[in-house]
């Protein structure tokens, strides 16, 4: 990625108190206020594909609000000042129809495609996981072909349909496979756990080419081995990261629609991401934050921190 020459910095907490100032992610400049942009952060406030507890439409703003907590100037784990070596900006939200899923998917695809024509990469704030389909379509256009998909989630999200509907949030990667949006020999799920509707869920998923790192393997193998497996799987391919916040244990992320116990810790999450430094990241999403079920902003803060980690990965890609 070609880095912008003179990035506009976020508002510093040493100059304006963190509870004040712009309401953009990490108090970054808005996209319209920068001449060029390497990474754009964009909200996708859509949750009409939710199968259980709704409310992820409020995720983007809650993540932005929680990002005020962050000190973002320098990240010692990457040894980088992410907002000095690249221009990162907040692109606002993609407007989408909450009453028509098909139309909303088209609107998200158009919005993300237009954005990727202007910037190097995007980090999307969900919204439910349905949004991954149009976002992957846009990433494919940017990449001129399918991408390596690494999907962090408690759930596979490869159902065929749910109550006959093709686009609820449990189906995006079935639809993506049907459209050849990801490389079936370079993609994987990470953090999968819990019971399934059928043993065929696993068989079907394997037929799509996914490799699975189950959540229990973090305890048996450790972070370094997990990172090695992911990097070996991705290789030099263009990478799309899709992160469902319910990959985290509800103790760390209660504010989500379909929580599953025995999940990853926030420490495990950020350490895995840090281990992926150097991969060819082109786009990412962080989805399923539903702040109505949160307390003390802990889920939104976890999501905001993950987004900040992703900006550092872009800086090192």
What is the meaning of each model-derived region?
Residues 2-317:
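Conserved alpha-helical scaffold segments that buttress catalytic/binding sites
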């Amino acid at each position: 990625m070609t880095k912008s020459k003179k990035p506009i910095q976020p508002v510093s907490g040493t100059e304006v108190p963190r509870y004040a100032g712009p309401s953009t992610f990490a108090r970054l400049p808005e996209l319209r206020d920068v001449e060029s942009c390497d990474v754009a952060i964009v909200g996708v406030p859509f949750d009409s594909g939710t199968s259980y507890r709704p409310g992820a439409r409020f995720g983007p703003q809650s993540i932005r609000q929680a990002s005020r907590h962050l000190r973002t100037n320098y990240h010692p784990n990457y040894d980088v000042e992410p907002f000095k070596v690249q221009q990162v900006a907040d692109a606002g939200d993609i407007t989408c129809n909450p009453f028509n899923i098909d139309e909303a998917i088209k609107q998200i695809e158009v919005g993300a495609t237009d954005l990727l024509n202007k910037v190097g990469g995007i980090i999307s704030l969900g919204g439910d996981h349905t949004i991954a389909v149009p976002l992957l379509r846009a990433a494919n256009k940017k990449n001129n072909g399918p991408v390596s998909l690494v999907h962090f989630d408690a759930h596979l999200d490869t159902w065929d349909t749910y109550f006959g509907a093709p686009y609820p949030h449990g189906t995006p990667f079935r639809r993506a496979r049907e459209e050849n949006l990801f490389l079936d020999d370079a993609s994987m799920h990470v953090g999968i756990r819990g019971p399934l509707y059928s043993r065929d869920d696993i068989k079907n998923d394997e037929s799509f080419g996914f490799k699975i790192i189950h959540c229990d393997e973090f305890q048996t193998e450790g972070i370094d081995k997990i990172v090695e497996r992911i990097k070996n799987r991705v290789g030099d391919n263009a990478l799309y990261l899709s992160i469902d916040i319910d990959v985290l244990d509800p103790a760390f992320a209660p504010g989500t629609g379909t929580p599953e116990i025995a999940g990853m810790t926030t420490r495990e999450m950020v350490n895995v991401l840090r281990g992926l430094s150097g991969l060819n990241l082109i786009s990412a999403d962080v989805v399923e934050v539903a702040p109505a079920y949160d307390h003390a902003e802990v889920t939104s803060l976890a999501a905001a921190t993950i987004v900040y980690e992703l900006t550092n990965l872009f800086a090192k890609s």
